C-alpha cells in the first residue's frame, strides 16, 4: 500500500492560510498585555502538519516577553485555528522571534562603515604629501 504524500504546494497554501488566520486571531482574540503590535512573518510546517514554526516581529514591546506570551497562548490559538481550518491535523504552534530585520539593519550598518573606512583610506593614500 502506498502512502499518500502531500504536495509541496498544499503545504505552502496551508502555511499561508495559517499565517493569515493567526494574524487576525492574535489581533482580535488574544488579550495578553505582553503582546503588542505583532506581525506574523512566515509559517513553516512539518510535512505531517504536526508542528508549525511561526516567525513574528514585534513593533512594540519586548520580543522575549512577546514570544513567551504567544507560546503561552498557543493552545488557545490552536483551538481557534481548528475551528477555521478544514484540515485533519492542525499543527502545534511554536512561536519564534524573527530577527531578519535587525540582522539586515546591522549588515547595512557594517557595510556602510566598511565603505566609509575604505573611502577614508583611499583619500589618505591618494592625498599629496604636505611640505613643511
From Swiss-Prot:
It holds the Pfam family RBFA. It comes from the Bacteria. Its main location: cytoplasm. One of its GO terms (biological process) is maturation of SSU-rRNA. It is found in: Cytoplasm. One of its GO terms (molecular function) is ribosomal small subunit binding. InterPro entries: KH_dom-like_a/b (IPR015946), RbfA (IPR000238), RbfA_dom_sf (IPR023799). GO terms for cellular component: cytosol. Belongs to the RbfA family. This is Ribosome-binding factor A. It comes from Burkholderia cenocepacia (strain ATCC BAA-245 / DSM 16553 / LMG 16656 / NCTC 13227 / J2315 / CF5610) (Burkholderia cepacia (strain J2315)). The lineage of its organism: Bacteria, Pseudomonadati, Pseudomonadota, Betaproteobacteria, Burkholderiales. The gene is rbfA.
Amino acid at each position: 500500500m502506498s502512502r499518500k504524500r502531500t504536495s509541496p504546494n498544499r503545504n505552502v497554501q496551508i502555511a499561508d492560510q495559517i499565517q493569515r488566520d493567526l494574524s487576525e486571531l492574535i489581533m482580535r482574540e488574544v488579550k495578553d498585555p505582553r503582546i503588542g503590535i505583532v506581525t506574523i512573518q512566515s509559517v513553516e510546517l512539518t510535512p505531517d502538519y504536526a508542528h508549525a514554526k511561526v516567525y513574528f516581529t514585534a513593533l512594540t514591546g519586548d520580543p522575549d516577553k512577546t514570544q513567551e506570551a504567544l507560546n503561552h497562548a498557543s493552545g488557545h490559538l490552536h483551538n481557534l485555528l481548528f475551528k477555521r481550518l478544514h484540515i485533519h491535523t492542525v499543527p502545534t504552534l511554536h512561536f519564534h522571534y524573527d530577527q531578519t530585520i535587525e540582522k539586515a539593519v546591522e549588515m547595512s550598518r557594517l557595510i556602510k562603515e566598511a565603505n566609509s573606512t575604505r573611502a577614508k583610506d583611499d583619500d589618505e593614500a591618494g592625498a599629496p604629501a604636505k611640505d613643511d
